[in-house]
Structures are given as structure tokens and as C-alpha cells.
């Protein structure tokens, strides 16, 4: 290496070139992730990876953006506060109520004090536990496409891109949808509370169904009808994957609070 390689201008130039290269890859990857469902996964397994960010890199970056925006927009899709564990429509609600009640009595603290610590841990854990859903969903894909004779890693790549899109939907799509609903209500002077979480669930489910249908068709090369049928079942299965995630999150927070 020459002395020029250690100069400040050369160092800054390399840094700018690297950032520009990453920015270009991110832009291309996001564009295809949103507007060409299944394309990035198909390209990756074909070995065409140079022009796009690798699946894990893309997901990590979007994950960071999501949790930053979630704190600003007050989204709790993955953080799941204690209140939801105890009174939400969760399969483990009764167990959670019993465990929390016993711990509060043993510690001699109020529910408000315990809830504050629990939710703080939940925010921290959710940033890493979200990764649990990716391999679980990949296992479902392997079952649905067992005759395709694909490697598990191929399903995993598809799953990573799918959950990356889900985060993008939560970052951009859901806030815009909420704004549209509330804006329409204000336009017609509808003063009662019109927006509920059921609107969010419905919106996300419909978006994921259509996105997944197109992704499956592109990646697994099956008919539109077959892909749509499997998408419907997988979208429903996602509810149980989310319950599994929230159960793991609850136990992680409970035993560390």
C-alpha cells in the first residue's frame, strides 16, 4: 500500500464510496422487495446476489428502522405489553394471569410497578426474539412444499424476505392506512372512535395474503390458484406463529423481571 492509501482524503473517499454502494443496494433491494414479490428470493437462490443486499443484511437494516419508527408511532405489534398478555385474546391468557398474580404477591409490588419493568424488558427482547418467527415460518413452507425437494435454507431465504416486507408494511403501509381511515372519519364528521385494532389486523392480513400469493408463485413456480390457496393457509398459520412468538416473549420477560 502506498502512503496515499493512508491519507485523509483517500479514507473519506473510500467511506463515501462504501456508503453510496450500500445505499444503492438498499434502494434496489427495497424496490424489488415491495414491487416484485418473491423476486429477491428467486435471484438469491440462483446465485445472482451482487446487485442486491443479502437477505439477513436487508432484514437487519429494516428491523432497526422498524423498531425506531415503532417507538415514534407507538406501534406494539411485536413489543406486546403486559396488559395485552393478561387481557388480550391470547391462548395463554389464564396462565399469564396466574403467573403474574403469584409473582406480584411474592414480591409485594403493585401491578403498575411490575408492568413498567415487564414492558421495558419486552421492548429489549422483542428486537431479537422477532427472529424466532423466521425459521418457524420456513418450516411451514417446507411442509407446504415438501414435494418441491428444496433445501431448508431456500425456504429460510424466502421467509426472511417475507418478514422484511411485513416490517416495511408496518413502517409505511399501516400508518398510511390509519391516516386514511381517521381522515375519512374526520371528513364526514364522524366523532365516535372508528379505528380499532381489528382494522389493523384486517388490513395486514389482506396485504399479506396478496403479497404472499404473488411471492409463492414467483419463487416456487406454481399456478396462481395453487399459490393463492397455500397463501390463504399460510396467512392463517401466521396467527399461530405470532402467538408462539408472544408466548416466548412473555416467558422471557417474566423470568427476567
Where in this protein do the model-derived segments appear?
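Membrane-proximal intrinsically disordered regions of secretory-pathway and membrane-system proteins
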Residues: 1-257
